[in-house]
């Protein structure tokens, strides 16, 4: 008998935990009204009205301007002390009429609550009834939809706020129009993605010959100023698009936590079949998305989209084993982004040992099938912290966690700089690197972009911290 001993590898442990502290130190996520405002600006002829203090609008618009380098119209009821004590319903009524008078093309106003207006208990639905009567009396020839969006800042995050606003806008409009003739279109909810991602998705649908409507269509967030164009930026999604969603062939949600509930609403109310796939970060998730589209629509995947993943695989294979293998990564941000990036990292031999999710939907995360997929694919232990903040990342680094790379939005840059760890900017907001909102992160092209960004961040770090001629020794 041989004296050789077998080494039994310990199964990887994927541990899901919640931040233990009550207080938040260096938050990594924004409030619910911020997400609701982002959903609102994705619709043409729509101006969100934030029922709260001016700061609830001003600082969010600043984030949008930093990330997209564009100006967006968001209104505020400018709640002050008197309204905080005696109620702010009058501020909403005045705000709606001012917007209707000032913007003749206005067709949709999501009325977004904040922590203060939720605490004082303003009756938004009742106030909307009053506003509808006033609008009908002053503008009998116009139909302006008012959507109630309950987004108190003391719970949830920009992710839940986005999902709540999308669902409320669809519910408000589709309830009026009801079910019509089948359109044969595919509703697509990509979640909180960049304009570059929307452009890529629309190219995929065009190449497959699929008549799809992307909600919300943010392609025009990156558009030039033209003589016939307003100074304010808005999305391409129209009220007609939303109304027609009830007549679609099917709905495809690409983000479990960012808009998927609207697909469930359309299925329950109008019998529109609803499907959910993993956000298409990386090659496999993109393959799965295209197969699902083909299954739903009966369309063939064209040769161009058969060739594209092969190009991506070659590009990533040139980097994976030589440069990425066994490199430890921490990822932070909103849930669909973080879990999707973790899956991508495993495809290219990176090891996402720490995932920080800036949202508290713990019961939902436990049921997320991606956790089991990560466990099945990983050969190392992984910690997933939900309701996390950036102190969780900083503390683990200070306690000795060895990392080769950090992935997340620009608010985590100080942690990376102080720890001297290379960082790839991805997610929202990213304002300390140029042009990232134009580039896709999803799909085959997005996989190549991410791989090259990761490699270049590591290469620059090697040059500045170890050996400026390191590449000669590698090749």
UniProtKB/Swiss-Prot annotation:
From which domain of life does this come?
Answer: Bacteria
Q: Which cofactors, if any, are listed as required?
A: [8Fe-7S] cluster
What keywords are assigned to this protein?
A: ATP-binding, Iron, Iron-sulfur, Metal-binding, Nitrogen fixation, Nucleotide-binding, Oxidoreductase
Alphabetized Gene3D superfamilies for the sequence: Nitrogenase molybdenum iron protein domain (3.40.50.1980)
Record's catalysed reaction(s): N2 + 8 reduced [2Fe-2S]-[ferredoxin] + 16 ATP + 16 H2O = H2 + 8 oxidized [2Fe-2S]-[ferredoxin] + 2 NH4(+) + 16 ADP + 16 phosphate + 6 H(+)
As recorded in UniProt, its EC number(s) are 1.18.6.1
- InterPro entries named among the record's database cross-references: ChlB/BchB/BchZ, Nase/OxRdtase_comp1, Nase_comp1_CS, Nase_VnfK
Q: Does the keyword Acyltransferase apply?
A: no
The free-text note explaining how the cofactor binds reads: Binds 1 [8Fe-7S] cluster per heterodimer.
Q: Which GO terms describe its cellular component?
A: vanadium-iron nitrogenase complex
Q: Which GO terms describe its molecular function?
A: ATP binding; iron-sulfur cluster binding; metal ion binding; nitrogenase activity
BP GO terms, sorted: nitrogen fixation
Sites binding [8Fe-7S] cluster sit at 31, 56, 115, 153
Q: How does it assemble?
A: Hexamer of two alpha, two beta, and two delta chains.
- Tell me, in a sentence or two, what this protein's role is: This vanadium-iron protein is part of the nitrogenase complex that catalyzes the key enzymatic reactions in nitrogen fixation.
Record-stated family: Belongs to the NifD/NifK/NifE/NifN family.
* The protein's name: Nitrogenase vanadium-iron protein beta chain
Q: Which organism is it from?
A: Azotobacter chroococcum mcd 1
Q: Which gene encodes it?
A: vnfK
């Amino acid at each position: 008998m041989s004296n050789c001993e077998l080494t039994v590898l310990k199964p990887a442990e994927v541990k899901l935990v919640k931040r233990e502290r009550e207080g938040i130190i260096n938050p990594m996520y924004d409030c619910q009204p911020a997400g609701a405002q982002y959903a609102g600006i994705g619709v043409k002829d729509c101006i969100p009205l934030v029922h709260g203090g001016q700061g609830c609008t001003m600082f969010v618009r600043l984030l949008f301007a930093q990330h997209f380098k564009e100006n967006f119209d968001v209104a505020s009821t400018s709640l002050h002390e008197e309204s905080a004590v005696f109620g702010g319903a009058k501020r909403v009524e005045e705000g709606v009429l001012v917007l209707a008078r000032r913007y003749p093309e206005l067709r949709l106003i999501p009325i977004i609550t904040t922590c203060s207006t939720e605490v004082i208990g303003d009756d938004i639905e009742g106030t909307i009834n009053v506003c509808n009567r006033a609008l009908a009396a002053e503008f009998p020839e116009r139909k302006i939809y008012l959507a109630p969006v309950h987004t108190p800042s003391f719970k949830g995050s920009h992710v839940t706020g986005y999902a709540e606003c999308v669902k409320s806008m669809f519910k408000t409009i589709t309830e009026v129009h009801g079910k019509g003739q089948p359109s044969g279109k595919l509703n697509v909810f990509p979640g909180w993605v960049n304009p570059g991602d929307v452009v890529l998705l629309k190219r995929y649908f065009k190449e497959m010959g699929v008549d799809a409507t992307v909600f919300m269509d943010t392609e025009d967030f990156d558009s030039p100023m033209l003589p016939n164009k307003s100074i304010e930026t808005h999305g391409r999604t129209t009220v007609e698009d939303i109304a027609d969603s009830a007549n679609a062939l099917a709905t495809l949600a690409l983000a479990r936590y960012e808009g998927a509930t609207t697909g469930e609403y359309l299925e329950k109310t109008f019998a529109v079949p609803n499907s959910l796939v993993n956000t298409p970060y990386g090659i496999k998730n993109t393959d799965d998305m295209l197969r699902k589209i083909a299954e739903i629509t009966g369309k063939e995947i064209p040769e161009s989209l058969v060739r594209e993943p092969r190009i991506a695989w070659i590009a990533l294979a040139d980097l994976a084993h030589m440069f990425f293998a066994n490199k430890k990564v921490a990822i932070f941000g909103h849930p669909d982004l973080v879990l999707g990036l973790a899956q991508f990292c495993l495809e290219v031999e990176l090891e996402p040992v720490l995932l920080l999710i800036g949202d508290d939907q713990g019961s939902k995360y436990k049921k997320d099938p991606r956790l089991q997929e990560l466990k099945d694919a990983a050969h190392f232990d992984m910690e997933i912290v939900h309701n996390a903040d950036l102190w969780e990342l900083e503390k683990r680094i200070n306690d000795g966690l060895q990392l080769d790379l950090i992935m997340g939005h620009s608010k985590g840059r100080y942690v990376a700089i102080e720890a001297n760890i290379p960082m790839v900017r991805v997610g929202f907001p990213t304002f300390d690197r140029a042009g990232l909102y134009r580039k896709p992160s999803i799909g085959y092209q997005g996989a190549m972009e991410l791989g090259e960004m990761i490699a270049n961040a590591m290469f620059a770090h090697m040059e500045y911290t170890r050996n400026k001629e390191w590449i000669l020794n590698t090749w």
